[in-house]
Design a protein with these regions (language model features):
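Beta1/beta-strand and adjacent pyrophosphate-binding region of the FAD-binding site
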Residues: 4-16
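Loop/turn elements at helix/coil->beta-strand transitions in domains of secreted/extracellular proteins
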Residues: 7-10, 29-32, 102-105, 138, ...
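Active-site-proximal beta-strand/loop segments in catalytic clefts of secreted hydrolases
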Residues: 13-16, 36-39, 130, 148-150
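N-terminal Rossmann-fold NAD(P) dinucleotide-binding loop
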Residues: 19
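Structural core of flavin- and non-heme-iron oxidoreductases
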Residues: 22, 82-143, 263-264, 290, ...
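Conserved N-terminal/central alpha/beta ligand/cofactor-binding core
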Residues: 25, 31-32, 36-118, 163, ...
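Flavin (FAD/FMN)-binding glycine-rich loop and adjacent Rossmann-like elements that form
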Residues: 45, 121-124, 132-144, 148-299
């Protein structure tokens, strides 16, 4: 197997919003950066595999609230270049934006699988990844490594202290529902409106029942639809279910769609709705949160 070696000042794992911002920030401060992404596409949850919207329009109570800095610059670049208004155009706009950073090099389809530490075990010396594009292994060496993978793959491979799962009660003790939510899965769906009614019958293989979901997840979906019908909507599962870790995107989306079309307060309005598309991958809460020198709380 072919083996390559890369040296840089910083290695960033994951090219979602956090990874892109970290890599671009470091490159603009003068560091040489290697950005690793296991998938063939940029964007993470806003990429064309997961298809979450970049920004939920109207999701804030403050009319003029917006992100500034690199996120604002990124969004402006997407709005300017994504003339198609779809995820393919968005991914192209992100790629063009990142390629403009001379000190940043992107490695797509590069899966991290090994971490080498120093003799005392308190510092990462190198990471090893398999690259489909380069057809072999790549050793990445740098003084600093940033884990933006979403699943904590670098942190877990390096045996950094941390925890898995979702523990809202740790910081939200005042929340009445905090202890009830132990698992979160999410997908996205795109809705269009037809000129004529379209009936829907739930497939027999879908085991989830939307009424078993947590109340907050059901309300979030209805509020999103009340703001605007056509477009992309986030669908979450916060309730109890068998084989929670194996909840598929199709099960989640079709259970929500069955509820909307046949039993929800919006059933009459939903007669002409069509499910145009949904994300093939499901995001869940079973990631790894490393315990660092600083911990961000909900406050």
């Amino acid at each position: 197997m072919k083996t390559l070696s890369q040296r840089s000042d910083i290695v960033v794992i994951g090219s979602g919003l956090a990874g892109i911002c970290a890599a671009v920030s470091a490159a603009r401060e003068g560091a040489t950066v290697r950005l690793l992404e296991s998938r063939p596409f940029l964007g993470g949850r806003i990429g064309k595999e997961v298809k979450f919207p970049y920004d939920f329009s109207g999701a804030t109570n403050f009319a003029y609230q917006r992100e500034t800095g690199i996120l604002d610059e990124m969004q402006f670049s997407i709005l300017r270049e994504n003339r198609e208004g779809n995820y393919c155009g968005q991914e192209r706009a992100l790629m063009n934006w990142i390629m403009g950073e001379k000190r940043l090099e992107l490695f797509l389809e590069t899966q991290l699988f090994e971490v080498s530490k120093n003799t005392s075990g308190d510092k990462i010396e190198s990471v090893t990844a398999i690259s489909s594009k380069h057809g072999g292994r790549i050793f990445f060496r740098a003084p600093y490594y940033i884990d933006c993978s979403g699943t904590g793959v670098l942190s877990q491979l390096s045996k950094a202290p941390g925890e898995s799962g979702l523990d809202q009660s740790e910081y939200e003790k005042s929340s009445a529902s905090s202890t009830a939510v132990k698992f979160r899965a999410a997908a996205s769906m795109q809705i269009v409106v037809s000129d004529s009614p379209v009936a829907f019958n739930l497939p027999n293989w879908v085991t989830l029942k939307w009424e078993d979901n947590h109340q907050s997840a059901k309300l979030d979906l209805l509020e999103s639809l009340n703001r605007e019908i056509e477009g992309v909507h986030s669908v979450e599962w916060l309730g109890k279910a068998k084989n929670e870790l194996n909840i598929k995107s199709a099960d989640l989306i079709w259970s929500a769609w069955d509820y909307l079309k046949n039993r929800s307060p919006l059933t009459e309005r939903a007669k002409n709705w069509i499910l145009e598309d949904f994300s093939p991958l499901t995001l869940n809460s079973q990631g790894f949160r490393v315990t660092g020198d600083y911990i961000i709380t909900p406050e």
